[in-house]
């Protein structure tokens, strides 16, 4: 190297050349460091995106799991709805000696309600194809067009999800 000019036998030109080579090498190394730093930033960014994607995936899976648990009883409740409605009709047509049947009906209704079951309002409401299924239409003076005249079969929600649409008769003006 050209550290000591007196003891060094190389010429000034050789020292300049060596210095230029070292500067060039330093520049190459600095460029390589910049490239590696950029790679590190890219890998870090990619890793952060993967982590965010994984966190979102976990949240989605937890949400789906809760939804599955929440609606796990849907099939059973659908089967029980016919019994529930039959009990209701029996109570409507009973005489006063059938108080026990009414107690059973209320207990059954309360159990279904606690499990997340709710009735869909129909009669007098505006027809909504997401909630109701129209099987009949009729021109009726007492109702506006598109209003439900009669509920033929009740509809139900289970935890905000429609599990049975109301079967209805709708007013349709001619």
Swiss-Prot record:
It comes from the Archaea. GO terms for biological process: protein folding. Keywords: Chaperone, Cytoplasm, Stress response. InterPro entries: GrpE, GrpE_coiled_coil, GrpE_head. One of its GO terms (molecular function) is protein homodimerization activity. It is found in: Cytoplasm. Pfam families: GrpE (PF01025). GO terms for cellular component: cytoplasm. Belongs to the GrpE family. Homodimer. This is Protein GrpE. It comes from Methanothermobacter thermautotrophicus (strain ATCC 29096 / DSM 1053 / JCM 10044 / NBRC 100330 / Delta H) (Methanobacterium thermoautotrophicum). The gene is grpE.
